[in-house]
């Protein structure tokens, strides 16, 4: 509970009312700047070599910087086990495989790779994804122009590759090397005719994240362990948009280079107390550029921030295991601004008896890298977000404060959990929120305050498991110059969100059903009486209305069988949006040349089937 996506994408995850860029996503300790394929509809992380995924919404360990909304820590296997494992398979979007190969007693290689089949096989799944991605994009809009376009052709593909090399020099000295690349590429040909002469030009967009890291783990004795890590994460978004109708071309790029050093030490004082401490250095370089040839226009910006962080925390577990506490302090120093940011954090849990447990979490956080959303100056109408760096003036450092208290009940395979939270995030910019009303072109600095309750219920039976999550929250903006300084609902203010799910297992067959519901996101309506002779729309009270509520039902089934004594296989089928419900994800308005107003909507995926087959060795 408390985690959803208002637009059905993995590249726009909203945690307790935050935007996606406020989530710190780590792959083996390396920050990732891209989390989705197919512009957010497919996860960019191959699940078959992910050993553990930890999600923290509050009370985060002080070893994590950034991520004022959450931390999503994806970890690959980090220990040698001398077992060979491999697998390969396909579905209606991609093919892929993985291998975990022991080279010797002291060495192991892990490899995984996926590639889409969308550029040479057209499937029903791809058809639905295509409609969803290109809806209201420049490509669809070009087809609605003056009729000069006679043909167009898009070619899209994605791939990801990850490699991890494990080498144990001795029992107490371990080296780990990581490499991963995530890539999306789109080419779009547009042909027009003028005086019987055909002209074809190509637009393209490429989005990629490449990361590499080296880690050294040292066990000094049974109590002291240290880790040193070097990493580099680069992100590139390049687009060329050739507009035949209006006779211009636009070249855009957004580039990030993130280099870091991490030192961490863990000291076991005794069986109940551990001390963690460390140092981190980060250098982030963000570049944005844009060039138009008709009329000639060029813009370029480049910012670099270097930060240093020291941290320390104590982790305590009582002898009877009833009380757990983690208390720490992180101090960030931003070299460019000469400023310190002090971030205390705490997580305390206490068992009242065998069934009930109380929990208190609190944290301070800050981050210097965020995303801005420019709906008029986007990448081909598809990717509207670009990474930017704080300049401590127009783009301040984002700071958050959060606290929550929860109670949990666990008995007879029944889990009941309730958590009340309060979160205040300051330093956001209006350009990062994606306004599509009277504030679309405004640039102001403000905050949002979200408060609510997350509830989770899970019951397990012999062959059946069911759970329900419910979140109630209110989320309001406050900007000094917007809405006369009065608070108004956040663009992702989802008051109610419910998820129901059930999994049934019988022998080698597994079937799952899920239902997702949430109330509609805020909407600003145009005024009935518009001013004449203007080039803008007159709007009513900001975010005072709501789009229709969202409801989706999914179903999936998997059958597992043996092919040989050492080989097994799985066959699966899934249907997203089983009842083909038409959900509105977004609604906004544009002004036509004749001063009339048109309403545009973004629709959810329709009924989307998928079939998979995998072999495991």
Where are these regions (language model features)?
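N-terminal periplasmic accessory domains that precede
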Residues: 11-14, 40-43, 58-86, 388
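Gram-negative outer-membrane beta-barrel transporters
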Residues: 320, 422-424, 443-527
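Surface-exposed extracellular loop regions of Gram-negative outer-membrane beta-barrel proteins
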Residues: 236-237, 290, 335, 355-403, ...
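Outer membrane beta-barrel strand-and-loop segments of large Gram-negative receptors
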Residues: 258-262, 301-305, 309-311, 392-396, ...
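Short acidic/polar hinge/loop motifs at secondary-structure boundaries
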Residues: 30-56
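Extracytoplasmic beta-strand/coil segments of soluble accessory domains associated
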Residues: 1-31
């Amino acid at each position: 509970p408390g985690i959803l996506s208002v637009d059905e994408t993995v590249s726009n995850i909203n945690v307790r009312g935050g935007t996606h860029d406020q989530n710190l996503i780590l792959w083996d300790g390396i920050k990732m700047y891209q989390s989705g394929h197919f512009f957010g509809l497919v996860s960019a992380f191959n699940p078959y070599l992910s050993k553990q995924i930890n999600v923290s919404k509050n009370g985060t360990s002080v070893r994590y910087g950034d991520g004022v909304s959450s931390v999503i820590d994806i970890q690959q296997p980090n220990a040698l086990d001398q077992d060979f494992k491999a697998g390969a398979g396909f579905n209606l979007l991609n093919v892929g495989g993985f291998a975990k190969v022991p080279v010797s007693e002291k060495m192991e290689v892990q490899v995984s790779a996926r590639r889409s089949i969308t550029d040479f096989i057209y499937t029903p799944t791809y058809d639905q994804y295509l409609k969803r991605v290109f809806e209201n994009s420049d490509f669809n809009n070009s087809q609605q122009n003056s009729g000069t376009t006679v043909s167009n052709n898009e070619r899209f593909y994605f791939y990801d590759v990850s490699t991890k090399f494990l080498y144990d020099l001795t029992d107490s000295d371990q080296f780990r090397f990581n490499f991963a690349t995530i890539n999306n590429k789109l080419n779009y040909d547009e042909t027009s005719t003028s005086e019987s002469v055909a002209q074809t030009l190509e637009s393209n967009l490429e989005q990629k994240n490449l990361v590499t890291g080296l880690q050294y783990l040292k066990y000094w004795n049974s109590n002291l362990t240290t880790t040193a890590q070097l990493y580099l994460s680069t992100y590139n978004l390049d687009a060329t948009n050739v507009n035949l109708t209006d006779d211009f071309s636009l070249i855009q790029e957004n580039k990030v280079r993130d280099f870091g050093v991490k030192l961490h030490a863990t000291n076991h004082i005794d069986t109940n107390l551990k001390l963690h401490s460390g140092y981190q250095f980060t250098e982030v370089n963000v570049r944005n550029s844009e060039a138009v040839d008709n009329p000639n226009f060029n813009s370029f910006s480049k910012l670099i921030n270097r930060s240093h962080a020291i941290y320390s925390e104590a982790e305590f577990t009582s002898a009877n295991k009833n009380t757990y506490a983690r208390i720490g302090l992180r101090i960030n120093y931003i070299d460019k601004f000469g400023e310190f940011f002090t971030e205390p954090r705490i997580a305390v849990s206490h068992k009242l008896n065998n069934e009930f447990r109380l929990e208190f979490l609190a944290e301070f956080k800050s981050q210097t890298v965020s995303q801005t959303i420019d709906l008029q100056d986007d990448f081909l109408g598809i990717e509207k977000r670009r990474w930017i760096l704080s300049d401590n003036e127009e783009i301040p450092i984002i700071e958050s404060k959060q606290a929550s208290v929860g109670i949990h009940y666990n008995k007879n395979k029944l889990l009941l959990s309730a958590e009340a939270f309060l979160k205040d995030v300051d330093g956001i910019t209006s350009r990062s929120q994606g306004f599509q009303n009277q504030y679309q072109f405004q640039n102001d600095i403000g905050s949002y305050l979200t408060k609510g309750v997350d509830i989770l219920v899970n019951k397990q039976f012999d062959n059946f498991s069911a759970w329900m999550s419910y979140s109630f929250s209110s989320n309001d903006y406050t900007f000094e110059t917007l809405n006369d300084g009065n608070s108004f609902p956040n663009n992702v203010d989802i008051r109610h969100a419910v998820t129901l799910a059930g999994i049934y297992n019988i022998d080698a067959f597994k079937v799952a059903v899920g239902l997702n519901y949430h109330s509609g996101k805020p909407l600003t309506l145009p005024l009935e009486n518009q001013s004449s002779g203007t080039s803008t729309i007159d709007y009513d009270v900001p975010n005072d209305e709501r789009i229709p509520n969202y409801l989706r039902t999914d179903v999936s089934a998997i059958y597992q069988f043996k092919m040989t004594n050492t080989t097994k296989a799985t066959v699966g089928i899934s249907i997203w949006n089983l009842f083909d419900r038409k959900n509105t994800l977004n609604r906004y308005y544009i002004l036509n040349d004749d001063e009339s107003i048109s309403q545009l909507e973004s629709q959810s995926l329709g009924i989307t089937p998928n079939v998979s087959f995998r072999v495991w060795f």
